[in-house]
From Swiss-Prot:
Subcellular location: Cytoplasm
Family: Belongs to the class-II aminoacyl-tRNA synthetase family.
Catalysed reactions listed for this entry: tRNA(Thr) + L-threonine + ATP = L-threonyl-tRNA(Thr) + AMP + diphosphate + H(+)
Documented EC number(s): 6.1.1.3
Pfam families referenced in this protein's UniProt entry, alphabetically: HGTP_anticodon, tRNA-synt_2b, tRNA_SAD
Natural source organism: Thermobifida fusca (strain YX)
Residues that hold Zn(2+) according to the record: C353, H404, H532
Cofactor or coenzyme needed: Zn(2+)
Enzyme class (EC, first level): ligase
Start and end residues of each stretch annotated as Catalytic: 260-555
Protein name: Threonine--tRNA ligase
The protein's assembly and partners: Homodimer.
Phylogenetic classification of the source organism: Bacteria, Bacillati, Actinomycetota, Actinomycetes, Streptosporangiales
Amino acid sequence: MSAVPELRITLAGTERVVAAGTTAGQALEADGRTVIAALVNGEPRDLTHELADGDVVEEIRIDSEEGRAILRHSCAHVLAQAVQELFPEAKLGIGPPIENGFYYDFDVAEPFTPDDLKRIEKRMQEIIKQGQRFSRRAVTDEDARAELADEPYKLELIELKGGAAEAAEGAGVEVGAGQLTIYDNLHPRTGEVCWKDLCRGPHLPDTRAIPAFKLMRTAAAYWRGSEKNPQLQRIYGTAWETKDALKSYLTMLEEAAKRDHRKLGVELDLFSFPDELGSGLAVFHPKGGVVRKVMEEYSRRRHEEAGYQFVNTPHISKAGLFETSGHLPNYADAMFPPIQFEGADYYLKAMNCPMHNLIYRSRGRSYRELPLRLFEFGTVYRYEKSGVVHGLTRARGFTQDDAHIYCTKEQMPDELDRLLTFVLDLLRDYGLSDFYLELSTRDDSPKFIGEPQEWEEATEILRQAAQKQNLELVMDAGGAAYYGPKISVQAKDAIGRTWQMSTIQVDFQQPKRFELEYQAADGSRQRPVMIHRALFGSIERFFAVLLEHYAGAFPAWLAPVQVVGIPIASEHVPYLEDVARRLREHGVRVEVDASDDRMQKKIRNAQKQKIPFMLLAGDNDVSKGAVSFRYRDGSQNNGVPIDKAIEEILTVIRERRQV
């Protein structure tokens, strides 16, 4: 009797010997519910994947980031199966997992209705309960075309094989550069193919492994993101590892809806988006303008203290500048069309960096001037597609707090350390404190330019700077800008959502393109390194993040109105006007409500406007030179001397405390 062939694998850091034909699931002793897939040599694989000699195997748990992505991708397949069973004429687009959920696009005659979603969700529950198995099989391009002959969008993806991920957002989950694969949903008893889809996987073992899901909404979406293509109907859903996790997520969404900056912007009279201006273009009202002004002034002061020099650049430039910078060859789709003027093409600027390079190049530079830190509140314009424009967080015109630092290679490590500390400290001053860092690097994509060695050096320096902050560091392979690696500061808000805030990017390419030089100590001409940095990302987006973080109740130093005087009767108005005058002398933003409304309504109005302090005054207060001091949360101290009340207000503002 011949011996069973054996394989040597590494499992949880330990070498093991297993029989040939052993699957990842068998090696992991996976239950298919908690451990739902495997990492084999760093690549996610189904539990049914047969192992080879030398494989390194790790578990993927359903409550991990990778595990949730697999869960959501599998749920997208169940969604598509349910739709095609209920709407047989529906043609399939793509259905990837996304942050906190998934979607699938369908070509159907009519948009889906809320009643349709209920029917689809019910059918999904039936499919899940049935326990259909996800089964992977490799197919030739020819066989895939034959099997999917009635799916025109899938056929298009097959023709784009190898470039599908670049051609259509989310298409990378279906078609890669290698052999095509199809996933069948198999009946648990008969093995009959219930449904199939072009897909790279991996997937859950079976549909019963989907613990909790919900369909959320529908939207229109152009195929491959182009308005020249057919408009499809997109169904969004979410899926989680437990029913409690789903409930927590839905509760968070309810709270997020209350904090939606677009809603609060109207309620608090901060900003608006007039139709006459066009999509993605905001106007700030006086109260919003005050908040923005305070944000900018504090940032400006901190930058001046940190050695930055302020500059200003125009909103428009001839095309040649953006050819030199590389933005037209690499970024043209995100720029507005050119304006023809005096025989030349002019573009609204999408980036400030090319103009800062011109400032650097305007005269000879010495090593003694470096690092040179240029800073600007520069307004830029980007052609965001209508489907992704979202209030202030994704606008077409916005102002960046944009800095570009020119330094020597030797100065770069210290400069990045200093810069990252400065960025985090300043964000903390605005009330954000829960951070992690993301390091975006290059991959094998041809979009990345420059020498690999320079990329490696810059990436390692960024990594070391990030590690010194003692924050979690997450790697993002392939997520860098085309010209250099970057660190992104990710911040959690009051309800646990993550926002990308500041970005710090190293750039060896722009100094070459613009032939930037400095005279070194030995008299030679050397090329500086350029560091791009936007601390807020944009003023508008940061405004929106803070508005939602504080649910409109800005800390006193940022509040558009910091104090409101509320007289008990009209004869108390002059007394409060005098208190207001004294506060204004200290720069406090104060109003007196002299309207005919009753006192309780005035208090309610101040609470609705989320004003931090209310000063109430009646006969007793006037006689004692005092006020009733009421906080935003409703707590109140009576008979507070005016001087003490003023000092309390000034202290809270000076210390940037929340009340």
